[in-house]
């Protein structure tokens, strides 16, 4: 494959430019996968789409090979990694050896934040430290007296996620809310995604029985969102936000919402459909998300950025241009750049985003 990269670089002149996109499968990241499919339809013949394996922790070499396969096409000028699972930094190094001109956008990095910023040209992520405040604040406003945070050791080894957890705990204490941390099975482990989902279906009723209906649930994993939404609605508890906030993340599958072909990407339609289902299920005022599909917006903006770069409309890292594209796809959002208060480390190419919340059936 490395040899193929070397042989094909020289033949790039005058070809149609392309952008590579790596996403999870429909099991691990349905929203990102569908966003990539939408880009394929929008830019026929100009998008190379690959997926990383569901058990990406054990199959990092597969992830690396998938990224290398996109870079082997000399017409690919930029690659968006949605999400930047382990193996991403090593893959970028390998590609840059042969294609130093390749532009990488790392979306939702799983590896060390500073390492991610050093390897990729641009990094995009929700502002997890700030969300540590806003999610608990929203849950409290929705009537939560207890906050249940569901995760597993691998996710808690990620600096931004562990920092957010600590902030959430402090915010709960500040508001007089009980803080509960629940260790769930890792979906990349032996039990797989099915085992993690089954745990959610069994554990949520136990927690509600113990702490009461005014309990807010938050999980750090994409694959857990559908069973979590379903269980919270059934038990009458509170669901303030997904790990990757978006009206498309978890809600349609959990609530049985069919999206007609003509309504794909129609955010107003999906917000109304969710509201109708939540209200009918007795969850009015107790379910929320962001008004924008953030990981889809990250994907759309990154693909457009890649084409703008390849077509000479911009050069290199242009944070303001990325902000403009994100505003186009995500609406009103707050932006900041990575700043680790504890270590003093900063990364100007690491853009953090917070969107606006909507409470379904709420006042």
Identify the function of each model-found stretch:
Residues 60-77, 94, 194-213:
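Short, well-structured alpha-helical segments in soluble
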Residues 95-128:
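Flexible loop/hinge segments that line or gate small-molecule binding clefts
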Residues 36, 128-181, 306, 321-327:
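An alpha-beta-alpha
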Residues 123-148, 199-202, 270-279, 293-310:
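Hydrophobic alpha-helical segments within soluble ligand-binding/sensing domains
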Residues 270-363:
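Hinge/cleft segment of the Venus flytrap/periplasmic-binding protein
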Residues 18-39, 43, 48-65, 80-86:
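Extracytoplasmic "Venus flytrap"
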Residues 20-23, 74-85, 102-107, 148-150, ...:
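Periplasmic-binding protein-like
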Residues 168-179, 226-311:
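Extracellular/periplasmic periplasmic-binding protein-like sensory domains
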